[in-house]
Swiss-Prot record:
UniProt xrefs under InterPro entries: CtaG/Cox11_dom_sf, Cyt_c_oxidase_assmbl_CtaG
Entry's transmembrane regions: 15-37
MF terms (GO), sorted A to Z: copper ion binding
GO biological process: respiratory chain complex IV assembly
Protein's recorded name: Cytochrome c oxidase assembly protein CtaG
Stated family: Belongs to the COX11/CtaG family.
Topology of this chain in the membrane: Single-pass type II membrane protein
Recorded superkingdom: Bacteria
Free-text function comment from the UniProt entry: Exerts its effect at some terminal stage of cytochrome c oxidase synthesis, probably by being involved in the insertion of the copper B into subunit I.
Keyword Ligase on entry: no
GO cellular component: plasma membrane
Length: 202
């Protein structure tokens, strides 16, 4: 005959099972949060301009200032067999004025390749005031073998930038893009450790 279980052992077994269930639940929650972290971080960056992330808008500025600012354009690739460059390296425009420029990409691979562009602005604080209306970076881009494709960007610099003490004397903004293979997790948000660039001032 089997002797009855010791009450203390039963209690300990129940406690151990409870701890195991809690640990398993925490693990599942952490895995779920890790998958959600990237899109949530991107959304945060796009809303606040964190780390030089530019803003996406649907309408033009209704205010155009007499003051001008220079915008430089930078292009990079990482892991895609493309030539990628801006048609113009630098332009001068009035603050609040909507302008369209273009980048050009050429696929040097013997197969069709697809890329996704990440983007940021320097100085990082200016990202919250750099507003894009149209951009190739909003969607993935596919190029056939040897295809050359011109990709427009339509943007303006928010007039509110002149009310920010750290930016009121800013002369030049640099807009930078990097194309990654579409099957990689691209970082539309900033690099780790980038400075916060939430809009300041009135």
């Amino acid at each position: 005959m089997t002797s009855p279980a010791n009450p203390s052992e039963v209690t300990r077994d129940r406690r151990n099972r409870g701890v195991a269930f809690v640990c398993a639940g925490v693990f599942v929650a952490m895995v779920g949060m890790s998958f959600a972290a990237v899109p949530l971080y991107r959304l945060f960056c796009q809303v606040t301009g964190y780390g030089g992330t530019t803003q996406r808008v649907e309408q033009y500025s209704d205010t155009i200032l007499d003051r001008t600012i220079n915008v430089r354009f930078d292009a990079n690739t990482s892991g895609v067999p493309w030539e990628f460059k801006p048609k113009q390296r630098e332009i001068t425009l009035r603050i609040g004025e909507t302008t369209e420029i273009a980048y050009v990409a050429r696929n040097n691979a013997p197969t069709t390749t697809t890329g996704t562009a990440t983007y940021n602005v320097a100085p990082a604080l200016a990202g919250a005031y750099f507003n894009k209306i149209e951009c190739f970076c909003f969607t993935k881009q596919s190029l056939e073998p040897g295809q050359t494709y011109e990709m427009p960007v339509q943007f303006f610099v928010d007039p509110e930038i002149v009310n920010v003490p750290e930016l009121k004397n800013l002369k030049t903004i640099t807009l930078s893009y990097t194309f990654y293979p579409n099957n990689q997790e691209s970082a539309e948000g900033p690099a780790e450790g980038a400075a916060k660039t939430q809009k300041l001032g009135g």
